[in-house]
Amino acid sequence: DESIKEMISKWSKQNLIQNLEHVRDGEGEFVDFRGKISNHELTEPINLIGLIDSKKGTIRANHYHPQQEQKCLFTKGQIIEVFQDILNPNSPKITQVVNEGQLSIIKPNVAHTMVFSKDTTFLNLVRGEREHNNYGVTHTIKHIFVDEAEKDLLLSCYKFNCRCCGNKNLKRVVSLGYQ
């Protein structure tokens, strides 16, 4: 029992994400009776914006980008994002929730899958070419690591807010198979 507690404690203190992927809220918000303005600073030029609509209960991605950093600004909905460093054979699968209004930034060579827990709309912001004919060749390489059974398991078991206070910003803890 002590060795398991020690292992869980050690794992819980590791920063497993290591800047592979991170989620940010908008900054410098302005709110009045008309609504809200939220700003997201981008650190590199963007030459392509894709508008993507996805239905609740579906999967997108299951791929990685060998050179491009991908930024996704979620305007509606929610996803469970699953990602893994493909350059590190010991890298665990890591999950996190991305909510409406948040920006997800995914580094090159990070396999990622989006499991849609709600009907979702997001802007895909990239630098570089994204010709559909080059899918699997230059900008996006298929890497299936979340199948339909795993998607269903995530959707049925994932907790999106605290059962006590309703907070949506839950801290990830060690679980079997995921971080």
Show where each model-derived region lies.
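Double-stranded beta-helix
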Residues: 7, 19, 23-25, 89-92, ...
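N-terminal juxtadomain amphipathic helix
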Residues: 157-179
